């Protein structure tokens, strides 16, 4: 029997959710591994770096509640239990309408291609971003460097902020993590007894001056200075330059740039959206290419509401729809499963927490059994994290 070849590029949230929903959830992984070795209709290959990082936990590096070891997993064992081949390579090109994947170590053909390759960040929008800012978007290395620099300071001015890419009509950025980082920084400095020696500023050109709401209230309660509507024209060493050529003192900057597509997206046969991302439709199908799918923060949405994100939980919903559509296509059935738009996350402030939620069908999270604001939500968030990481490590 000739097996259908499925190639998955990337080993982050979107790719792992796709695998989870495409294959049966194994209750007994050893039996499942044996069964897939004896009989499988598919030959699945994952191309990536083999390291999974649980990015939603990165802000908690600031309080010392999370560290690199706790949130990083060698994903090769997860794949091996499912009899999935892993290729430790960097994809350099995609050709032949998606059928040919070229890496730095070889070429791989496929019948179905799934793209969960992650984004690139618009670090050239503001000069000096690469040289003079740190970001949770860059992973544990950058967050550890931020903590080290913070710990070396006895006092100072810290700026936290974000920018989003609005060209595709939705929130293509990671503002939520930055709100969390700001509140956790306030908590960490208070725990050390030095909060009065630091100014914390929060800025974003994508928040209107005078904007109000629950998040703004939480920032103001903590004495965080709001620079809504502000965007520096350049980051400098210890300073930020304004458009009138004046300067603001900034001893430390934690900043999340807007999201766009990687060089692979721009330079391959993949269609590109206005915002520079993979142009995908409401079924997760890459437009104009047969049997090529994408999910996560590498791909645009089709006609999205302006508030929708595309990473983490939204990646899960889209990957689930893609898995169903790929199964239907391989079985000769219509691929017509769409996905709901949803923003759902718990904002941990250490001494408080909020469940931020919006959805296209107005359904509350988990049938509204959890409060929208309670410190107990931190425990709920930790349970979700521990369950998912346990699943990846052992099931």
Task: Walk through the language-model features, giving the residues of each.
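FAD-site-proximal beta/loop scaffold in flavoenzymes
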Residues: 130-154, 248-316
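FAD-binding core/adjacent interface of flavoenzyme oxidoreductases
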Residues: 2-7, 83-180, 184-191
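Beta1-alpha1 glycine-rich phosphate/pyrophosphate-binding loop at the start
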Residues: 2-84, 167-209
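Short, electropositive alpha-helical surface patch
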Residues: 167-184, 212-222, 311-318, 346-358
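Short hydrophobic core segments
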Residues: 9, 108-120, 249-258, 319
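C-terminal, flexible cofactor-proximal segment of oxidoreductases
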Residues: 323-395
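A Rossmann-like FAD-binding core segment of flavoenzymes
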Residues: 42-45, 82-101, 186-280, 333-334
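A conserved FAD-binding loop/helix module that cradles the flavin
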Residues: 173, 295-341
């Amino acid at each position: 029997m000739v097996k259908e070849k499925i190639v998955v590029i990337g080993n982050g949230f979107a790719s792992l959710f796709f695998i989870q929903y495409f294959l049966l959830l194994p209750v007994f992984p050893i039996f499942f591994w044996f069964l897939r070795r004896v009989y499988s209709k598919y030959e699945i290959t994952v191309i990536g770096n083999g390291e999974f990082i649980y990015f939603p936990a990165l802000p908690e590096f600031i309080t010392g509640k999370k560290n690199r070891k706790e949130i990083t997993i060698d994903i090769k064992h997860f794949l091996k239990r499912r009899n999935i081949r892993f290729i430790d390579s960097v994809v350099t090109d995609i050709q032949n309408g998606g059928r040919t994947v070229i890496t730095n170590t070889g070429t791989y053909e496929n019948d179905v291609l799934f793209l969960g390759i992650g984004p690139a960040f618009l670090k050239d929008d503001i000069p000096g971003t690469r040289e003079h800012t740190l970001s949770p978007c860059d992973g544990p290395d950058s967050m550890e460097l931020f903590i080290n620099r913070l710990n070396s300071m006895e006092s100072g001015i810290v700026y936290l902020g974000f920018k989003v890419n609005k060209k595709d009509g939705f929130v293509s950025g990671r503002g939520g993590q930055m709100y969390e980082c700001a509140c956790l920084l306030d908590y960490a400095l208070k725990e050390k007894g030095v909060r009065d020696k630091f100014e914390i500023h929060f800025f974003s050109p994508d928040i209107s001056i005078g904007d109000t709401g629950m998040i703004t209230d939480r920032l103001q309660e903590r004495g965080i200075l709001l620079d809504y509507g502000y965007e520096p024209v350049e980051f400098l060493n210890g300073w930020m330059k304004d458009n009138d050529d004046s300067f603001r003192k900034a001893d430390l900057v934690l900043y999340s740039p807007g999201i766009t597509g990687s060089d692979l997206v721009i330079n391959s046969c993949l269609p590109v959206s206005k915002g520079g991302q993979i142009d995908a439709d409401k079924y997760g199908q890459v437009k104009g290419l047969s049997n090529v799918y994408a999910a996560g923060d590498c791909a645009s949405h089709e006609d999205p509401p302006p508030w929708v994100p595309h990473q983490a939980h939204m990646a899960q919903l889209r990957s689930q729809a893609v898995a169903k559509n790929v199964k239907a296509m391989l079985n000769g059935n219509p691929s017509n499963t769409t996905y709901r738009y949803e923003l759902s996350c718990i904002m941990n402030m250490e001494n408080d927490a909020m469940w931020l939620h919006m959805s296209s069908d107005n359904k509350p999270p988990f049938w509204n059994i959890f409060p929208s604001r309670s410190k107990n939500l931190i425990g709920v968030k930790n349970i979700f994290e521990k369950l998912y990481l346990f699943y990846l490590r052992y099931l």
